[in-house]
């Protein structure tokens, strides 16, 4: 039962954090990013926010520094938007699955091109 609630809250947090980052965080270091997933512990005390950033390594690094600095602001905004007793501690992590999927896709295309 708790697991289903954690998934529902995670989906809502994903939408709210995207809105906060896009519309409220004014740090110019925040690049174009997409939140791919939010994983919550069953007690909703910690949340891992997985995201991808469009850009080179320096832009990715700058975006993570800006998000780390804005974590308190994002938490306070979440507190006013969501009805939770305790707002989870946020941890931002880079989601490499998109890059990995693109790499696999390129390899498959190369194999098909070599077969012809």
UniProtKB/Swiss-Prot annotation:
Gene Ontology MF term list: ribosomal small subunit binding
Compartment(s): Cytoplasm
GO cellular component, one term: cytosol
Keywords for this protein: Cytoplasm, Ribosome biogenesis
The organism's place on the tree of life at top rank: Bacteria
InterPro entries: KH_dom-like_a/b (IPR015946), RbfA (IPR000238), RbfA_dom_sf (IPR023799), Ribosome-bd_factorA_CS (IPR020053)
Record keyword Cytoplasm present: yes
UniProt xrefs under Pfam families: RBFA
Quaternary structure annotation from Swiss-Prot or TrEMBL: Monomer. Binds 30S ribosomal subunits, but not 50S ribosomal subunits or 70S ribosomes.
Chain's role: One of several proteins that assist in the late maturation steps of the functional core of the 30S ribosomal subunit. Associates with free 30S ribosomal subunits (but not with 30S subunits that are part of 70S ribosomes or polysomes). Required for efficient processing of 16S rRNA. May interact with the 5'-terminal helix region of 16S rRNA.
Record-stated family: Belongs to the RbfA family.
Protein name per the record: Ribosome-binding factor A
Organism, scientific name: Staphylococcus epidermidis (strain ATCC 35984 / DSM 28319 / BCRC 17069 / CCUG 31568 / BM 3577 / RP62A)
Lineage: Bacteria, Bacillati, Bacillota, Bacilli, Bacillales
């Amino acid at each position: 039962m708790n697991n289903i609630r954690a998934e529902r809250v995670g989906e809502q947090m994903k939408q709210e954090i995207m809105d906060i980052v896009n519309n409220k965080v004014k740090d110019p270091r925040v690049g174009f990013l997409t939140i791919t997933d939010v994983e919550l512990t069953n007690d909703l005390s910690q949340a891992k926010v997985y995201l991808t950033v469009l850009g080179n390594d320096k832009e990715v690094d700058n975006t993570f520094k800006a998000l780390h600095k804005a974590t308190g602001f994002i938490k306070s905004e979440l507190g006013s938007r969501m009805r939770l007793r305790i707002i989870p501690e946020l941890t931002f992590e880079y989601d490499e699955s998109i890059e990995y999927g693109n790499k696999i896709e390129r390899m498959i295309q190369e194999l098909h091109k070599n077969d012809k």
